[in-house]
Design a protein with these regions (language model features):
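Terminal domain-start leader segments
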Residues: 1-236
Length: 236
């Protein structure tokens, strides 16, 4: 499908499910700066392949917000697509939140995949649409429903790095983390950032091109640590 056809398909889904505005950010479930192929939903719906940007689709308009690093690239890749470029930080250019607040109708509905939106950003969106008494539905990934050949989540194996490369054992790192937890009165520490999980566990992966990161989460208590990971990645 062309970009125009993808946007048309998304709008049909939006109408069927009652969305007035649908937002597609760049992020993955871990708020990574660079994401694996499965998470490149914004690139799929706009054709813009830069590492930063947010797409917003309405019944009549499609827009892409990105920063100054990508103005030239975005203008080239969006040409003829029907997607309007919003140059972030430029005079007179609304933020994503300002734009949504303006275009969403009274009692309308804003949608996005809540798994890839940080809490702070989500709260900003709640506040943006509140004056219009609009609702937010973050339970559906509409892009997944139209992306027929979407790459699967990476199943590439994890691998461990020895202390000669990491400089410190996982046990030592956990001991230091637990000391910090005590200082802050915490009994449970949840790690969602991929680089933090990899540093703590001394594990690496190949789930994001050019970055040795591993799709995973970790939960540390005073007694143990649990690693949440696709078990197909583990060989031992």
């Amino acid at each position: 499908m062309s970009i125009a056809e993808r946007i048309t398909a998304l709008r049909a889904l939006m109408a069927d499910r009652g969305y007035d505005v649908y937002m597609v950010p760049t992020d993955d479930n871990h708020q990574s700066e660079y994401v694996g192929e499965h998470f490149k939903a914004r690139a799929f719906i706009t054709g813009f392949t830069g590492s930063a940007g947010t797409a917003v689709i309405t019944k009549d308009e499609a827009g892409l917000w990105t920063d100054g690093r990508y103005f030239v690239q975005a203008a080239q890749q969006l040409e003829g697509s029907g997607v309007k470029l919003f140059k972030m930080g430029e005079p007179g250019v609304p933020t994503v939140e300002e734009y949504i607040a303006n275009v969403i109708p009274e009692n309308g509905t804003l949608g996005f995949d809540g798994r890839v939106v940080a809490m702070g950003e989500g709260q900003a969106l709640v506040e943006a649409v509140a004056p219009k008494h609009a609702k937010i539905n973050y339970s559906e990934d509409l892009i997944d429903l139209i992306w027929e050949d979407r790459p699967a989540l990476s199943e590439k194996p994890a691998f461990a790095l020895g202390e000669e490369y990491t400089g410190e054992s996982t046990a030592s790192k956990l001991a230091r983390i637990r000391e910090a937890m005590k200082e802050h009165g915490a009994t449970v520490h949840v790690i969602a950032a991929l680089d933090d999980v990899c540093w703590t566990t001394n594990l690496r992966g190949d789930d994001i091109e050019y970055f040795p990161l591993l799709l995973s989460y970790a939960v540390i208590t005073m007694d143990d640590m649990k690693l949440y990971i696709d078990e197909r990645k583990l060989t031992d």
